[in-house]
Structure formats: C-alpha cells, structure tokens
Amino acid sequence: MSAIENFDAHTPMMQQYLRLKAQHPEILLFYRMGDFYELFYDDAKRASQLLDISLTKRGASAGEPIPMAGIPYHAVENYLAKLVNQGESVAICEQIGDPATSKGPVERKVVRIVTPGTISDEALLQERQDNLLAAIWQDSKGFGYATLDISSGRFRLSEPADRETMAAELQRTNPAELLYAEDFAEMSLIEGRRGLRRRPLWEFEIDTARQQLNLQFGTRDLVGFGVENAPRGLCAAGCLLQYAKDTQRTTLPHIRSITMEREQDSIIMDAATRRNLEITQNLAGGAENTLASVLDCTVTPMGSRMLKRWLHMPVRDTRVLLERQQTIGALQDFTAGLQPVLRQVGDLERILARLALRTARPRDLARMRHAFQQLPELRAQLETVDSAPVQALREKMGEFAELRDLLERAIIDTPPVLVRDGGVIASGYNEELDEWRALADGATDYLERLEVRERERTGLDTLKVGFNAVHGYYIQISRGQSHLAPINYMRRQTLKNAERYIIPELKEYEDKVLTSKGKALALEKQLYEELFDLLLPHLEALQQSASALAELDVLVNLAERAYTLNYTCPTFIDKPGIRITEGRHPVVEQVLNEPFIANPLNLSPQRRMLIITGPNMGGKSTYMRQTALIALMAYIGSYVPAQKVEIGPIDRIFTRVGAADDLASGRSTFMVEMTETANILHNATEYSLVLMDEIGRGTSTYDGLSLAWACAENLANKIKALTLFATHYFELTQLPEKMEDVANVHLDALEHGDTIAFMHSVQDGAASKSYGLAVAALAGVPKEVIKRARQKLRELESISPNAAATQVDGTQMSLLSVPEETSPAVEALENLDPDSLTPRQALEWIYRLKSLV
C-alpha cells in the first residue's frame, strides 16, 4: 500500500481499514462493507489485474483519491478460488458490530486468512488431489521437511539428507504453499514455485517447535510419535503448525498426531524418476495417460487421494503388501455390490476437517448423515468376506447410529447452502424454534383473513394486503378508489396507479413477525453450533472411520482393476531379482488400438544387467518403463499386468530416460543427463532398479561411448544394481563377453525394402543392425536425403567395415584411439623457419612457445 504520512488526515473508516491492513501487509485484505468486499490502494490495483475486475476510485481520504475494487459477498468463493490458484493469500475482514448501535465505523476484524495451503472449503479444493501446506528448513547436517493436509489433519515430517532427496520430496508432495526461513540457502530448490512464504527465523526454533507440538497433541514429550530425535524435521513442523493456527484463527482438534516418514520404509524415487514414469502427471503436465489414470477408478474423492499417496510412496514392508494382496483377492467377488454403496459415502474426510474447524456448512452435515446411512449396508456386505484385514476395516468403520439419528432429527432433507439463510434445522427438533416459526409462517393466513375483512368493511374491491422487503406490510388500494380510504389508513407509499397504507394493527403484527423471524434465525444458528459440540467429541472415531472407508475404496478399486484388466498377483522373493512372464505396460496397453505384445524379463543375482538394443520406435523405452511400473504396482500391494511375476527387495527406482534442456537453470540436455546419471551412480545399491536409456547421446560419439561403457561397467561390477541399459552403441553388446552377470536382449524388427515392421518382441542376443535409415524414411524424411544417407553409410562401412565389432574395453579401445589434436606449440614450430630468425626473434619465440605449452 502507498505510504501514508498523516494517519489522522484520513476518515475514521479509512483509519480502521489502515489499522487492519497494517496487520496483514503482505496479503490482500477483503474489507466487508455491506453486500461487498472492498479492496483499497495497492490491494485494489493487484486484485483488478488478478481477477480482471474494474478498478475505480472512492472519494478522497487525506486529500487523495482512493483506488478501489470490490466483489459481491455472495460470489466471494469464486474469486477466492481464482486467487488461491494463483498462489495468493487473502485476509477476510467481516463486520462484527451492529450498525444500528455503532457510533462511528462498524466494528470489524479479520476472521480468517485464506491461503493456498490452508484452504478447507469445498469450492476451493481439487477433490481428487491432496492440498498440502509445507515447511522446509536447512542446517549443516541436511534438511527438515514437514507437510500438513489441513483438510484431513494428516501431519508428516521427514529429514532428507541431501539436495537430491529434498528435490524428490518436493516433487512427490507438490505443496500448494511452502514456508521457508528468511536465510534459506538453497533457493534454487524452490524458486519458481507458487505459494512461497518467507518466514522469520524465530518461527523455526526447536524449543518453540516442541512446545507448540506438545500443546497441540496434549503431550509432555514427542517420544510416542517417534519424532523426538528429528530436530530438523521438528523445526519445519513447528513453523508449519504456528502458521496454520495463525491463518485459521481457531483450534485445530483434527490434527492429533504427527508421523515420521523414513527413507527405509518406502521405495525411494527421485524427481526425475517420478516425472519419467508418469505416475500421476504426464510429461506435458496433464493427468491423461498416466498410471493413476488407469488404476484410479475409485468412487470417493478421499479414496482417490489415498491411492495417489500409495503410488508416490510404495512400501517395502512385505507384511503390509501381503495383507493388501490378500484383501484384493478376497474382495474381487464383491466389487459390484460394494462400489455403488461406497460412492454414496462421498468425501467424509474433508467434511470432518470442516467440522473440526467449525466451518462445516448445512449441506456438509447432510452429506455426513448420508454417509452414516450407508454404513449398515457396507457392514452387512463385508460381514461375509473371509479375510481378517477386511474384518479389521469393517470394525474401524464403526456404525455411529446415535449420530445418524441426531442428524436425521436435526437437519432437513435438503438444507440451504448457508445457515444464515434459515430453514436448516428440521421441525420437531426444538420446541421453541417451532413456536417462533409458527408465528412467522402464520403471516400468510393472517394477511388473507385481514384482506377479506377489510374488503368487506370498506367495500373496496381493489384492496389487497401485501409485503415487500423495503416497506414491510401494507394495504394497497387503486388510485381510482384511494379517495375512499378510511380515516385510520396512514399513507406509506405512493405508486403510479395505487396508494399503499398501514394501520396500527398491521404495524403491530409486522413488528411481531419480524421479531419472530429474527429470533427463529438466531435460535437456529445457536442450535447449529450446538450440533458441532455434540459431534466433535466423536471426531477421532469419525476420522478413523473415514480412513477405513478410503482404504476400502482403494482396495475394492484395485480388486476391480485386477479383474477387469486381467492382472495377476505378484510373488515376493528374498533375493534381488525380477522375473516377469508376459509383462505388459499398464498404460500403453489401454491406449493402443491393437493387441499389446507382452514380453518376458529376467533379472537375478546371476543376470543383473540387460543391454537392450534395437531400432528407435522398436519399444525399448516402453519395455523398460513397464518393468519399473510393474515393480511400483507390486510394491503398493496391487496386482500387476503380467501372466506371472516374482520380485525381490527393491530400495530405490532410478530412471535416466530422455531429457530436455533445463533452460531455467541454464543446463543443456547433456548436462541434465549427466546430473541424473551422477545421482544414480552415487546412490544406487544392489537392491536398486535402474533404467538407463541412451546414455551419452548428447555429446560426441567417442565421448558418449566412453561414458556409456564406463557407466554400464560401474553399475554391473561395482554397484551390482538390477539394470536395464538401452543403447544405440553396438560396441556395448560386447559387455556380456567380459562380465558374467550381463546379458544382451533386443527388440525385433523386420525390414523389407524401404519399409520396416516393428515386432515389439524382446529376444535374447544383440540386434543385428540399427534400422536408423528405415525409421527416418518412416518419419517422412525426403527420399533424396535417405538415398544420400545410404550412399554415405556404404562409404563409411567400407572405410571401417568392422566398426561394430571393434574391441572396446578398459585396456584397448581401438574405436576410441583417435589421434590427439595437434598442440598449438607443435603447429607453431612446424611453421617456423629457424634460419630466418634473428637472435632476438628466437628468444621471443621461446617465450611464446612456452606460453602455448
């Protein structure tokens, strides 16, 4: 806002505004004035641009016109949604005083702050995506990271050890709002993100954090949560919790615990891997043709969000995985009956969060009632399922018959949007409310009786009784008969063709009705708040029920997907390895218009690396990605697209597949590729699954081949990771001759004249040729260019007929033994005529040559 030099020069209302704005200088302030929220000064200018609304001026204050923009209060949610989507935060300032009794400006205060990471309103949230508030902290030992989903109460912290792991966490969680300390060093990690909030250092103090968290959970220490020895994570969590409390302006009873996320509990995937595998987002940034788009046929929003969390955090605990597999198997015959009932449950998780924040609307309570009404049917269907995990879920679900009965008695079948609209509480629930309503609702009968009586008394056939919001109740007589109005009729309003009157009896009744309506609405609001008080003691059990219902939705969905898409149950083995019979790519097989060619895969301690060759477009990348996706699906407990799968322990999945220039960071394609490769070579273990596609293609042939050879050698000999290594360097097909746990496979193709047929079938052994020219022809490269390329290829092959079979290893690499570039000093000496030099010139040349060496 513009600097205001003389505060006292402003009107009292603007002084009130400026005081409130000074408390929230960084964010937009919606200042309630009657039926509008107004914005002033710089806020008005920003809002007019962000929301595409008119920028006007309001009179003058301190001698200057005031820039102003406004939005109607009844449409505020739409405008808030637009601002939140742009990463903006808004302070909502309401009138809390009574205009009738106020001297000077009506009392106002900020009642809530809407920020991208703390929204819980249904209209502002993406229903099938988590909306996370996060905080990041860094010290000399690493990072601390905490996330909170305020719409469910899910509170997590972790301590990423290095920059790569931290980047992967940001990619996985994708927070809507991120808090960071004012001295945060790694700004390049978070630059460009929406919803960045710079916070003072003291908010990250460890002692303050412990105090805040213990106060929130009602505990003396944090040992029971397993986070006591995570100081960096606690620093982030403390700042995050304080921010959530500051913005919500209320208690947060649904946040009742915090969980530590440890690397060893889940399969680690870095940011590049999540991007390349297109788990929930494709490479173009959309949701189409992703793994989630195939697997997610859940029928509740909370189930959809849980499935996506599973996909981004595959678990390594085989006990949990076997339990999920057993449940999916047991539910396969019940999906048709369960899914229609589950669909009626809706988003109970987020409704409960709004209940906890006391912002639940009447329709939220109606939906909660509807969810409770489904529980008996769900429990009855699940009773016959022979599975201990299913029965455990059934118990967690509960019944809540008393709460269902309460809401059936208290809330009408189809309530209005807001409690202030009235008519929310059902008749029969409260005797006093029914009496006030009867008085208000009896107005129609009274007015009809009054109209009949007055017509008979006056003999005026145009007389009628009515009501409008401005003038209240009135008796109307046409202009032609108005001169006959009785003497006790007092004129209230003159119209073109009629006169309107009031009589003492009608005025008295009007006061009585308006009083009864006001009292009914006030009592209704009070009863509505009391409903929160009756429901909130059950919040913990209700949250457990919502979690169980979401998990049931996910497992029923995976059972349906397994049956519909012909998936099989994978087997977990103790030793590293992956054996797949007739494996398929879960996404590609759904979008193809022709049958998908299934392929086998065998990786074991004796066969740790496959060198994959074959033509471009032959299916190398698909084959590699399908292996990673099958492994990922197995480790969320899902069935997988194959005839049979045996899979050993996996700690990490890495992919180095494709690359593009990172223009924002000034990194070339090759630099991006090498950075990702370095991350793999530093962090992969013998239990990692590594996908390497076309390493070294971003530089010269010799450099690229050298790097590809050395990387393959390191992965096979030193790291011993389970590796799929696709390459166009045929020299690498000699690796199996030098290393016993490396094997060649290739994708088959048939060439006939200028055409090529991709068989998409994986065969043992190396590919016989590259088919590059045939693929170029298929892509539409002009025939004269293809013809010239064939001619050039024959020339090159005649010069080096055995290029593909050249020995390339650590001691002898004839293909790489290219002549070194001539030194500038040698070139200078060759061009020098010593006989023509004077002694002085000879001395100068010695110094010059010295500088060239």
Swiss-Prot record:
The organism's place on the tree of life at top rank: Bacteria
Described purpose of this protein according to its UniProt entry: This protein is involved in the repair of mismatches in DNA. It is possible that it carries out the mismatch recognition step. This protein has a weak ATPase activity.
Residues holding ATP: 614-621
Signal peptide range in chain numbering: none
SUPFAM superfamilies (alphabetical): DNA repair protein MutS, domain I, DNA repair protein MutS, domain II, DNA repair protein MutS, domain III, P-loop containing nucleoside triphosphate hydrolases
Gene Ontology annotations of biological process type: mismatch repair
Organism: Shigella boydii serotype 18 (strain CDC 3083-94 / BS512)
Gene3D superfamilies, per the entry: 1.10.1420.10, 6.10.140.430, DNA repair protein MutS, domain I (3.40.1170.10), MutS, connector domain (3.30.420.110), P-loop containing nucleotide triphosphate hydrolases (3.40.50.300)
Pfam families assigned to the protein according to its UniProt record, in alphabetical order: MutS_I, MutS_II, MutS_III, MutS_IV, MutS_V
Name recorded for this polypeptide: DNA mismatch repair protein MutS
Keywords: ATP-binding, DNA damage, DNA repair, DNA-binding, Nucleotide-binding
Cited SMART domains: MUTSac, MUTSd
GO molecular function, one term: ATP-dependent DNA damage sensor activity
GO cellular component term of the entry, any: cytosol
Family the UniProt entry places it in: Belongs to the DNA mismatch repair MutS family.
